[in-house]
Amino acid sequence: MSLRDGEKLEIRFRAPSGRTADLTWGQQRMAQLMADLQPNNASLNLKFAHRIKPGLKADEVASAIRGMVEACESARTLFEPDAPSAQQRVTTEGVLHVAVITAVTATFTSALESAAELAGTPFEADDLPVRVGILTDRSGPAFVLLAINHLASDYLGAHWMTWHLRHVLQADFSDGEPSAIHPVDVSHWESSEAGRREGARALLRHERSLARMPQSMLPRLPVEPLHPRYRYVVMQTSAGAWCLSHLAKRHGVSETAVGHAALSLVLAHVSGLSRAHLQVCVSNRAGRDTAAVVGCLTQDVPTCVAIDDADFDALLRRSAGAIHHATLTGRFPHRGLMEVRERVEKRRGFPLDLSYWLNSRLFVPLPAEAPNAARIREEAARTSVRWLGGDQCSTSTLFCYLDRRDDILEVLMLVDTAYVAPAEAEQWLRAFESILVTAVLRPELSADALVAETGVVSFRATDDWVKIDHSWIHLPTTAARLHAALPGMTLRLAVETPGGEASLVAIVASPRSGRETSAPSDTVVVEALRGCRVGMRPHRFVSRAGDVQD
């Protein structure tokens, strides 16, 4: 078989099993995110480029691709997320059209660009969830390109999908083999009594985290965003990689926990808060039965750590505990988490801004050598920060990825420019590295001293701001939202501090002064604040005669 640029190979597949099931809990979360980003949710598609072993023929590569599709139910599942039931259907036969792309010299960079083109459009309901391409050059097939619908697989699931191509790829697959369990099996387990029990336990843990966290990690008002609004900035640091690994070894925690602590410290300092919360992407693969499933099991787990003392070691232990519990929490029904969140928001009086994320892909620790201050400083001088192109879509204010490229730590950050200025994002990345480096070179420093070394400026409140329930509340914004939601009520806001704890009081104009007046429905007020990250429901409504407006 010879390949020509622009042609499409037709790979016919046939498999014995054709099954249906509801979406798994992980798929439900992804389906909601896709709906939120409509009509342009292609940014969620996974994309990969894998180098082909030299000397292979095109028909050998095509045969391996056929074997992958036939072995992986996820690669031949059709999705209809809005259906009342059986939202995923595994097909038994069909045709996969493989794009052929020719280059004079195929490089990894050009392969990634071609994979991005494959992933550049959303998957339709009648599309197979995998697009495959072959990049060739004068020597023959050079790269297999994959674009995967995120409903079909997450990052780790894609690794096990490409395991089926191991005989034609140069990649190392010595860490095991895929599970015989498929997403349909996962969905059936989740609807079982055992699955419902595990989901209920997980939701109880998440409710405790949601009850502790600040309303938002960036208590600020939006500004006119740049175009494009959402932008990627990446830092590549050898010094950061080495120091992160050394801190993990020194304190007996995971590298992800160290990254979580450093990012939490930066955000809490920026915001002037004593707690930090992050949504952590958890693969749900701690169990032996789910470790190697080809599918989308990843869910976002809320974490919250206190940053109210001077001990950096304590912060590392808290982050390690948060990551440990998040990893072992287990799967949970996505709709159940939405209900828990609404219950907590109603109780606390404000909508939670859960748009700050950490996705760590630091799976294999880097060997940590003995500290060498001169080498660390030399490597830190080579750290690079650069902005990436492209028009991104997101629902996040800040999404941070931790990856390793050989001995380089890559910190990729997606920011919403309505809340984060480009110069700030760069400064926060540098601060992240600075905390890691300084914690290694000067282990006696406290957390406060470490973040002070970065030069990042902390939030400074004015008279318009008040800290209530570990969150910054903007009084003018809250008043404006209440006036819009309660048009028949004339009121102003006041802050009381009985027992030292601040509370928000709405003083309502009434002929009868000094009495508590009936408050509007908690649900009505919280919904009126939806989309506002710096407003809250008053704790009390008190009547007062005369004009009460500011």
Give the location of each predicted region.
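Short amphipathic alpha-helices and their capping loops
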Residues: M1-L37, S63-A106, D126-L128, H182-R229
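A short, small/polar-residue-rich loop/turn motif at beta-strand boundaries
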Residues: L9-G18, P54-E70, A86-D127, A314-I323, ...
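Gly/Ser/Thr-rich phosphate-binding loops and adjoining beta-strand/alpha-helix segments
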Residues: L9-R14, G18-T20, N40-E60, A125-L145, ...
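Active-site-proximal acidic secondary-structure segment that organizes catalysis
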Residues: R14, G26, I101-T105, V130-D185, ...
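Flexible, Gly/Pro-enriched loop and linker segments at secondary-structure and domain junctions
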Residues: G18, L23, R29, A42-A49, ...
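His-Asp-centered acyl/peptidyl-transfer active-site segments
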Residues: Q38-L46, E73-S74, G140-P141, A194-A200, ...
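Extended, hydrophobic beta-loop-alpha segments that form or line the acyl/peptidyl-thioester binding
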Residues: C72, R76, T162-W163, S274-C281, ...
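A short N-terminal helical cap/helix-turn-helix that marks the beginning
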Residues: L78-F79, L169-I181, S209-S216, A423-F459, ...
